[in-house]
Amino acid sequence: MSQIDIYNIQNEKVGTLDIKDEIFNIDPNMDVLYRYVDMQLTNKRAGTASTKTRSEVSGGGRKPWPQKHTGRARAGSIRSPLFRHGGVTFGPKPREFHKDLNKKMKRLALKSALSVRYRENNLIVLDEVKFEKPRTKDVKNILSKFGMEDTKVLFLFPYHQEQYENFKLSARNLPKVKVIIADNPGQNKKNVDGLNVFDLINSEKIVLTKEMVNKIEEVIG
């Protein structure tokens, strides 16, 4: 077991928390991290790019000029790829972009990403976050207290509760702040839906609550 300090939103230390080494302090597997991010970015591709071949563009039914005696290069159709408005050779067509990883590799990637941030001292645990109403100024005050005004920050919360929803609304105007509520209320079992490797490693600091730490340990431990 390792320990991590717990802070309040005023950046005052209020205690420590035991965290599992097998989740937050493993030797990161960079290959699996790469595979996970590659999978995420690949699966975001729409695959809708499409061009027309010479058989699909309009026109080109007859030979534009005689084969001989014009002094011009021979041509059989004005929709040849050599012509303006002609068909495209080897252009993109709609296709399915999809990659997947097995559950074991996905969990290893999440653990690796969390461990990277923990070892960099870029993992911050808050005792609680209470937002009675959305207010961007309050989020900016928290960032200021921790010296993160110009830092890419990821906030992780465990449940779709009013206080966390209000925080998410408060932060939506801040371009360097992302908030993930890692929960799917439609599932009966506990889950960390929304928690992903790309956002973990794309942020410079990760801020989460004690509840979120416990939930991560319970679900992916």
From Swiss-Prot:
<dbReference type="InterPro" id="IPR023574">
    <property type="entry name" value="Ribosomal_uL4_dom_sf"/>
</dbReference>
<comment type="function">
    <text>One of the primary rRNA binding proteins, this protein initially binds near the 5'-end of the 23S rRNA. It is important during the early stages of 50S assembly. It makes multiple contacts with different domains of the 23S rRNA in the assembled 50S subunit and ribosome.</text>
</comment>
<dbReference type="Pfam" id="PF00573">
    <property type="entry name" value="Ribosomal_L4"/>
</dbReference>
<dbReference type="GO" id="GO:0006412">
    <property type="term" value="P:translation"/>
</dbReference>
<comment type="similarity">
    <text>Belongs to the universal ribosomal protein uL4 family.</text>
</comment>
<keyword id="KW-0699">rRNA-binding</keyword>
<protein>
    <recommendedName>
        <fullName>Large ribosomal subunit protein uL4</fullName>
    </recommendedName>
</protein>
<dbReference type="GO" id="GO:0005840">
    <property type="term" value="C:ribosome"/>
</dbReference>
<feature type="region of interest" description="Disordered">
    <location>
        <begin position="46"/>
        <end position="74"/>
    </location>
</feature>
<dbReference type="InterPro" id="IPR013005">
    <property type="entry name" value="Ribosomal_uL4-like"/>
</dbReference>
<dbReference type="GO" id="GO:1990904">
    <property type="term" value="C:ribonucleoprotein complex"/>
</dbReference>
<dbReference type="GO" id="GO:0003735">
    <property type="term" value="F:structural constituent of ribosome"/>
</dbReference>
<keyword id="KW-0694">RNA-binding</keyword>
<dbReference type="GO" id="GO:0019843">
    <property type="term" value="F:rRNA binding"/>
</dbReference>
<keyword id="KW-0687">Ribonucleoprotein</keyword>
<keyword id="KW-0689">Ribosomal protein</keyword>
<dbReference type="InterPro" id="IPR002136">
    <property type="entry name" value="Ribosomal_uL4"/>
</dbReference>
<comment type="subunit">
    <text>Part of the 50S ribosomal subunit.</text>
</comment>
<comment type="function">
    <text>Forms part of the polypeptide exit tunnel.</text>
</comment>
